[in-house]
């Protein structure tokens, strides 16, 4: 009898402990893993063996969750990263231009990050690896809701510029215009410069960032806190400096070797979730900041789309995008609907228990000790991901780094009013006599305009869409009256955007 009572008491205590532990972590953890300039076809879940090189750990996210065919970012680093963490189009926040060492522009404290909004739900947030949202202390993630940051602030080739024989040797020049080192910062205002990100350090920097992400996850788990971790690998931005461990490992060249390193890191993160027993309560997202950079091949990515990073063809904006969300996303799902990086903020806030964050922010919403009044350009895509409804997004706006609106996509149709042609180092705008029209379900790689029969057999019958396209852009720009641009991202005003688009349409 005593043994039975003891057993019953033990079971009750175990049950109470389990319930107490679950209560602390009932909100889903969020792990967002980003590569840098990663090509869609450099991931084997996309290339399906067409190319050499495999990424079994990244593929695992797809097989246990969803793979997106129409996932969109922006045309370059800063724009793509800001759109994700702020949920606003970078034309609105003024973050379309690539952030540089010594620059004064960067993320504004008037725009809430995912980390700040998650504070209301008890989350701890860490960002590790590349940031690229501003050079100054007040731009650092820890000034914008993140509890900890360990990483670099710029694109890799900017980090190694001081090693050039032509780089000015004057210490004052470097102090004013040179890249800062790899920083370790915390929300209490402490900032430690751990030293420059040299070519040599680039060989193993991702291991440093990986260790920091793992440590943060473990500490959050032990504290019973839901976490948001944004882990940013340096792979595969140029120039790639591999450690001896990965040189020649794939048998398919430098890029595939680097992808093996990136994939191994993803595997370590996924294994950590399994080890801690929290994989079933963690949303995992994999993506990147912009379209692949192809002109530096073989130290460049591979994609099936026309164009590349810096252009306004699909190759500049479409990115690999995968999500594993146990209990919400059915394993093996293929998502063909339009999904943009801005959509993650309202979607993840809905997962945390706040599906109306967009409406709240329009009126004024308090988070992280501040009141924010902003217009989110992202949509809550929970219904799409859960299979309970259609996608919420119909449109994509293709702005370049100079704040020029070059093209729009509305549902299946894309209209190029102007085109950013070429690679990011020499891209130039060209204005076709008539705007180009592409049906992206018929012609996802935008080959049609190169066809000799394009005008006669397709284009001439589609000019009806010029005026409706202006209405779509007009609706977007109308929101700027109450929620204006945060800072000038270029020389083009909102009125000029509409004027140039109308002028392009009138040329037909």
Name every feature range the model reports, one short phrase each:
Residues 2, 7, 18-435, 440, ...:
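Formylglycine-dependent sulfatase
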Residues 12-18:
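Hydrophobic membrane-targeting signal helices
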């Amino acid at each position: 009898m005593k043994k039975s009572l003891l057993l019953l008491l033990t079971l009750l205590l175990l049950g109470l402990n389990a319930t107490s532990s679950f209560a602390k972590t009932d909100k889903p953890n969020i792990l967002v893993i980003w590569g840098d300039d990663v090509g869609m076809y450099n991931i084997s879940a996309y290339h399906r063996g067409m190319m050499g090189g495999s990424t079994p750990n990244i593929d695992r996210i797809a097989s246990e969750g969803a793979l997106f065919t129409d996932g969109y970012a922006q045309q370059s680093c800063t724009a793509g990263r800001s759109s994700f963490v702020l949920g606003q189009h970078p034309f609105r926040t003024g973050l379309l231009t690539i952030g540089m060492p010594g620059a004064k522009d960067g993320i504004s404290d008037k725009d809430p990050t995912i980390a700040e909004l998650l504070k209301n739900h008890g989350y701890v947030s860490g960002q590790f690896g590349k940031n690229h949202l501003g050079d100054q202390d007040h731009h650092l993630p820890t000034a914008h809701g993140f509890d900890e940051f360990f990483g670099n602030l710029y694109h890799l080739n900017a980090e190694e510029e001081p090693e050039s024989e032509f780089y000015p040797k004057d210490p004052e020049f470097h102090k004013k215009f040179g890249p800062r080192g790899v920083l370790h910062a915390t929300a209490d205002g402490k900032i430690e410069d751990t030293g420059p990100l040299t070519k040599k350090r680039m060989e193993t920097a991702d291991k440093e960032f990986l260790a920091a992400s793992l440590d943060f996850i473990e500490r959050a788990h032990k504290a019973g806190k839901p976490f948001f971790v944004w882990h940013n690998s340096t792979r595969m931005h140029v120039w790639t400096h591999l450690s001896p461990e990965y040189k020649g490992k794939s048998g398919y060249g430098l890029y595939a070797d680097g992808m093996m390193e990136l994939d191994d890191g993803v595997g370590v993160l996924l294994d950590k979730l399994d080890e801690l027993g929290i994989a079933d309560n963690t949303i995992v997202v994999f993506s990147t900041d912009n379209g692949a950079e192809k002109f530096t091949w073989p130290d460049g990515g591979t994609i099936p789309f026309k164009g590349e990073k810096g252009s306004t063809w699909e190759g500049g904006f479409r990115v690999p995008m995968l999500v594993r969300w146990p209990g919400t996303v059915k394993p093996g799902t293929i998502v063909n609907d339009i999904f943009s990086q801005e959509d993650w903020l309202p979607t993840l806030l809905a997962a945390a228990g706040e599906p109306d964050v967009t409406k709240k922010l329009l009126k004024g919403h308090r988070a992280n000790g501040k009141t924010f009044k902003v217009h989110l350009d992202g949509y809550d895509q929970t219904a799409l991901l859960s299979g309970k409804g259609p996608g919420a997004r119909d449109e994509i706006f293709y702005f370049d780094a100079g704040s020029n609106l070059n093209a729009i996509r509305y549902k299946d149709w894309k209209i190029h009013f102007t085109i950013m042609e070429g690679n990011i180092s020499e891209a130039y705008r060209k204005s076709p006599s008539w705007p180009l029209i592409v049906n992206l379900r018929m012609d996802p790689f935008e080959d049609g305009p190169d066809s000799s029969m394009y005008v006669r057999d397709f284009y001439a019958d589609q000019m009806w869409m010029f005026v409706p396209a202006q209405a779509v852009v007009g609706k977007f720009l109308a929101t700027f009256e109450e929620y204006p641009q945060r800072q000038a991202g270029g020389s083009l005003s909102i009125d000029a955007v509409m004027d140039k688009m109308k002028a392009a349409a009138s040329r037909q």
